[in-house]
Amino acid sequence: MALEKSLALLPLLVLVLLVLGWVQPSLGKESRAQKFQRQHMDSDGSPSSNPTYCNNMMRRRNMTQGRCKPVNTFVHEPLVDVQDVCFQEKVTCKNGQPNCYKSSSSMRITDCRLTNGSRYPNCAYRTSQKERHIIVACEGNPYVPVHFDASVEDST
């Protein structure tokens, strides 16, 4: 009798495990928009002349785990202003895709570049503050930045 009850519950258990197998990989997985924000947004941090800014931020934002990310840019503007870039001048991305947009005004950014000779796990970065137009790739609904493509000087 107990064996029959156990066998009757087996299909239900299999179904639950299948559903968990389907759902679980998406739980806790960072969306492309969330990854963009983690890797590129620092609205609260004003750009400073602190030479260790990049070393600290790259480590804090998990871009030195397993390898040293060679180049990264942080944007020091409100998130809504960066999201608005998705509705500004359309440009072609470096990889040839048509979903990049250039900001209509300059934005405060910090460029972080891995210094020569720096090797994992001792990632060391050169910090440089700039005011530049940013180019981001956008996608999704809502249409938001998912990739930082470049920064360019004002052409005027």
Swiss-Prot record:
Lyase found in the keyword field: yes
Enzyme kind, highest EC tier: lyase
Catalytic machinery residues: H40, H147
Residue positions binding substrate: K35, R38, K69, P70, V71, N72, T73, K94, R113
Primary location class: secreted
Entry keyword ATP-binding: no
Disulfide bonds: C54-C112, C68-C123, C86-C138, C93-C100
Glycan-modified residues: N62, N116
Ranges of Basic and acidic residues composition bias in the record: 33-43
Biological role: Endonuclease that catalyzes the cleavage of RNA on the 3' side of pyrimidine nucleotides. Acts on single-stranded and double-stranded RNA.
Record's protein name: Ribonuclease pancreatic
Organism: Saguinus oedipus (Cotton-top tamarin)
Gene it is expressed from: RNASE1
